[in-house]
Structures are given as C-alpha cells and as structure tokens.
Amino acid sequence: MTDRLTDRLSVIGMRFSGRHGVLPHEKVEPQPFEVDLVLHADLRAAGASDDLADTTDYGSLFDLTAAIVEGRSFDLIEALAAAIARAVLAATDPALVGAVEVRVRKPKAPLSGAFETVEVGILRRRDDAPTDRAG
C-alpha cells in the first residue's frame, strides 16, 4: 500500500481554543491552538469518480480534530498531536489513508521573549507499531 500513497489530502490552519499546557493557568484559561493535517492517501479513485465516497471527508476531519483540541486537556502539545493522529487513523479507511502528519501550533505559549509560535510536528503511519502511551 505504501507505494500508492503519494497523494496528499491536507487541512491547514484549523483554529481552536483549548486548555493545554503544564502551567496551572493554562488549564483554566483557553488559549489559541492551530492544527494542520496532511493525510498520505490514495486519491486515484476519488479523482476518477468525483464521488465523496471514494475519499476522506475533510469536514469530518475538522470536527474530529475540534473535539480533541477543545475537549480533553493535555500537558504537552506532543501528546495532543499524538491523540489527533491516532483518532484520524482510526476514523479513516485503511485502504485510502496510510499515514497522517499532524502539526500543532501554540502561538501564545508562555515564553519570556518575542516569538511567532511553538510547533510540534509528528508523522504516524498506520503500519507502525504504536509507541504513544497517552490516549
């Protein structure tokens, strides 16, 4: 399957409010988070058929990501990204999606200097052995 996964389906710059971080105030006050998803997929059937049934609905990817970011609180954005990746792989057709890249940005991270954002990026392949502990 990996040799067919040269196509990409991306949802970039999704914006949510969440309570993620290790500091006490980060658990109380919502702060902005941005998430990008890049699915490594086989989009040939969808390209030929023009049928939503032959691809992954990016509206459902947005809703799934929103539920995770705006729901449970994580200490680390690494754990948040891993939870999103697991959920995306669980919710998508294994014949279509073989891997997902997740980038989580925290533009209001509690740093003492000027910066644009803090970002974590992960790649999870469906056929990789699970290495994440958090769920």
Tell what function each PLM region has.
Residues 1-135:
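N-terminal, polar/charged subdomain of small-to-medium soluble alpha/beta proteins
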